[in-house]
């Protein structure tokens, strides 16, 4: 299925059913009192985070969603049925914004599986005419109309939730690495931008199968990515939720005069996009050591040691050095990103004073 991480949709909650204007009519009781029932409430629209979903593709196919209306009230004090709620399943990590005129407002971040959020409240059902009987009004010929359901225009943005993000220049071997560390099977080829969408893989501890870690293979970043060049900043946002980064550099991209230029280019793009990303712990990895001559590999390791950098030298193709990298990844498992907690503002209920009243005339 095609990976889609941003869509705009509209949602309309159900309208409340109208209250009924009715009077008791039985044998020997030609002029009974009012007995109109209440209308049913309209259905709500609810968003639910679903860990089985990885894309917003379905919401690009269908752009408008409407919940069921409430039934109107009936005579003999019979109330209308409530409209059925519409529950829309979204990938974990989806952020919802409401669009009002030319502005946009944050509503909710579905950052945990199973989280539900009432995005649009159904209209309340109108009260039947039996509610308006009084000592001075014995035959009320009016009832409340059902309230309109809330309607909203929304932008949905998916930011992948992963423990670690695998980043680097194009063709650094990131896809091969994630396939070696997990059961993911991304498209792999020897040319830049093979990965056009983020790939997810789950890394499982051989000694403890319940110990798992989610990896995200982020498409290759080039100089100017923060300004939209290459695959652009559309994928940089997927790094924001990771706890730490695995920064991969191909041995073929190492220059003797400036061996770590590849690391610097990517880090500069991260800094330009969001300077807080530079606080994220990075595991520096040099990949494709199998294609190097032993003398050159030895020289690069000496340069790394003299620079004070801790760098893991691996070959994702042959598996050389993978075991040491895996140990380092598990040591960072408990690392937590100190993200600010966002308090959600609940949807407020309206007072009865805001309810409309419909006047309905009936014949005696």
From Swiss-Prot:
PANTHER family reported for this sequence: DEVELOPMENTALLY REGULATED GTP-BINDING PROTEIN-RELATED, MITOCHONDRIAL RIBOSOME-ASSOCIATED GTPASE 2
HAMAP family found in the cross-reference section: GTPase_Obg (MF_01454)
Q: Where is each Obg domain found? A: 1-161
- Binding residues annotated for GTP, in chain numbering: 168-175, 193-197, 217-220, 287-290, 315-317
User: Could you describe the subunit structure of this protein?
Assistant: Monomer.
State a GO cellular component annotated for this protein: cytoplasm
Q: What is this protein called?
A: GTPase Obg
**What Pfam families does the entry give?**
GTP1_OBG, MMR_HSR1
Q: Which cofactor does it need?
A: Mg(2+)
Q: Which UniProt keywords apply?
A: Cytoplasm, GTP-binding, Hydrolase, Magnesium, Metal-binding, Nucleotide-binding
Alphabetical list of InterPro entries matching this protein: G_OBG, GTP-bd, GTP-bd_Obg/CgtA, GTP1-OBG_CS, GTP1_OBG_dom, GTP1_OBG_dom_sf, OBG_GTPase, P-loop_NTPase
All copies of the OBG-type G domain together span 162-334
The organism named in the record is Lawsonia intracellularis (strain PHE/MN1-00)
Q: What GO annotations for molecular function exist for this entry? A: GTP binding; GTPase activity; magnesium ion binding
What does the UniProt function comment say about this protein?
Answer: An essential GTPase which binds GTP, GDP and possibly (p)ppGpp with moderate affinity, with high nucleotide exchange rates and a fairly low GTP hydrolysis rate. Plays a role in control of the cell cycle, stress response, ribosome biogenesis and in those bacteria that undergo differentiation, in morphogenesis control.
Q: What is its main location?
A: cytoplasm
């Amino acid at each position: 299925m095609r990976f889609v991480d941003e869509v705009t949709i509209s949602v309309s909650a159900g309208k409340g059913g109208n209250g009924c204007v009715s009077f008791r009519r039985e044998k020997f009781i030609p002029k009974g009192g009012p007995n109109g029932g209440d209308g049913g409430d309209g259905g709500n629209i609810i968003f639910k985070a679903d860990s089985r979903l990885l894309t917003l593709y379905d919401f690009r196919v269908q752009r408008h969603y409407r919940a069921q209306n409430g039934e109107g009230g009936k005579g003999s004090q019979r109330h209308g049925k409530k409209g059925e709620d519409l529950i829309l399943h979204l990938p974990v990590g989806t952020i919802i914004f409401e669009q009002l005129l030319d502005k946009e407002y944050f509503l909710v971040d579905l950052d945990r599986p199973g989280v539900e959020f009432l995005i649009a409240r159904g209209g309340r059902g109108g009260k039947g005419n039996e509610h308006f009987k009084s000592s001075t009004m014995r035959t009320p010929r009016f009832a409340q109309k059902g309230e309109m359901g809330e309607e909203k225009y929304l932008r949905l943005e998916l930011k992948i939730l992963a423990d670690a993000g695998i980043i680097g220049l194009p063709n650094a071997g990131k896809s091969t690495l994630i396939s070696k560390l997990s059961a993911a099977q991304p498209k792999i080829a020897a040319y830049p931008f093979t990965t056009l969408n983020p790939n997810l893989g789950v890394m499982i501890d051989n000694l403890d199968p319940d110990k798992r870690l989610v990896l995200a293979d982020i498409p290759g970043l080039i100089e100017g990515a923060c300004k939209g060049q290459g695959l652009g900043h559309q994928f940089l946002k997927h790094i924001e939720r990771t706890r730490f980064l695995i920064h991969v550099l191909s041995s073929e991209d190492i220059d003797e005069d400036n061996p770590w230029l590849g690391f610097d280019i990517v880090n500069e793009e991260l800094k330009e996009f969001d300077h807080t990303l530079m606080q994220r712990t990075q595991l520096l990895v040099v990949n494709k050591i199998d294609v190097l001559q032993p003398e050159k590999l030895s020289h690069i390791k000496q340069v790394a040691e003299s620079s004070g950098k801790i760098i893991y030298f691996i070959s994702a193709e042959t598996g050389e050095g993978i075991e040491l990298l895996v140990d380092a990844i598990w040591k960072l498992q408990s690392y937590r990103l100190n993200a600010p907690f966002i308090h959600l503002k609940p949807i407020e209920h309206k007072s009865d004073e805001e309810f409309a009243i419909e006047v309905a005339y009936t014949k005696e």
